[in-house]
Amino acid sequence: MPEYVNWLRHASPYINAHRDCTFVVMLPGDGVEHPNFGNIVHDLVLLHSLGVRLVLVHGSRPQIEARLAARGLTPHYHHGLRITDAATLECVIDAVGQLRIAIEARLSMDMASSPMQGSRLRVASGNLVTARPIGVLEGVDYHHTGEVRRVDRKGINRLLDERSIVLLSPLGYSPTGETFNLACEDVATRAAIDLGADKLLLFGADPGLLDENGKLVRELRPQQVPAHLQRLGGNYQAELLDAAAEACRGGVGRSHIVSYAEDGALLTELFTRDGGGTLVAQEQFERVREAAIEDVGGLLELISPLEEQGILVRRSREVLEREIEQFSVVEREGMIIACAALYQIADSDAGELACLAVNPEYRHGKRGDELLERIETRARAQGLKTLFVLTTRTAHWFRERGFVPSSVERLPSARASLYNYQRNSKIFEKAL
């Protein structure tokens, strides 16, 4: 079977979930200049064709810097913000205008050899962002540098309803007719919040947020962000992370940070279970919970391969439905990726941990430990004093977690009478 067939099948739940959703996408000026920009445009067009309502916000910092240099002007910053005097504003307007035209031209391609063939996109832009001056801070006059006051929510939604891609530039206008230079991150964040967007997607040079060892941080809650901001200082990763967290606190469902340098990063983030960037979300991306009857199908899919290998005892759908209240599960993006069950042994103060299973793709984490802790907590709450486990393949894992070798004779009689001598499972116990 071709690989793309399998990919499409796995992506179909996300295609359905994203249809008619509003995504605000922020692409900095560096991303527009990058060789991968054409692929990003193709991916945005694909999202549009799948029914996603798209608002694209572009940056222009390197383009502004180039125009300042060409005119022999020195850029001035204070606390990371550009000071936009009259001469600088001319460069800003020039850079933003040319960049907007270039982006619109890319989105208008309809060549037979292009992935955009037949797309017939309409790009809409205009005076959709109202701004105000930052003014004077700490004695520094920012002149024409501004901040977003509001976005035209009704106007943008009307354009989205008409199947247009809305393009927002880092310029804002005041009721008095002034033009202000804005940070594209600010425009994107405010647009996402004011529109009640389902997602804010932020492009950066890196795959997402990297920890102190250079390893990708895949998911965060907004309350975890300040610690990372302190570590990052004032670099661009910090700006993106701050914007992502602010959007979530403002009611945006999820914020994502992905790389503009990696071909397909946007699609990987949106149409695969683990993504390829960093997710910031208020709700838990993955959680441990008690199983419900709706989980039976997912449990069967998880444990069937292990049953075929003889690692787990076979359980039919009927058995799982009858015993579903004994199970705890780890759910990730709607998929059951791990499970464990607790059975109280009749006429005793002991319980049995059974059917501990983790999807092979997720065994690198601590999900087994999380489930064990959950089962032990449940056992103590039920007044149980001892936890038994019978295993054929994972004895060392349990011994490393405080279980000690036991025997059939140590099992309560109700469980000992059911012991399968042909299976010859090793028995371990742990005092609670």
Swiss-Prot record:
Pfam families: AA_kinase, Acetyltransf_7. Gene3D superfamilies: 3.40.630.30, Acetylglutamate kinase-like. One of its GO terms (cellular component) is cytoplasm. Its main location: cytoplasm. Transmembrane segments: none annotated. One of its GO terms (biological process) is L-arginine biosynthetic process. It is found in: Cytoplasm. It comes from the Bacteria. Its EC number is 2.3.1.1. HAMAP family: N_acetyl_glu_synth. Belongs to the acetyltransferase family. ArgA subfamily. This is Amino-acid acetyltransferase. The gene is argA.
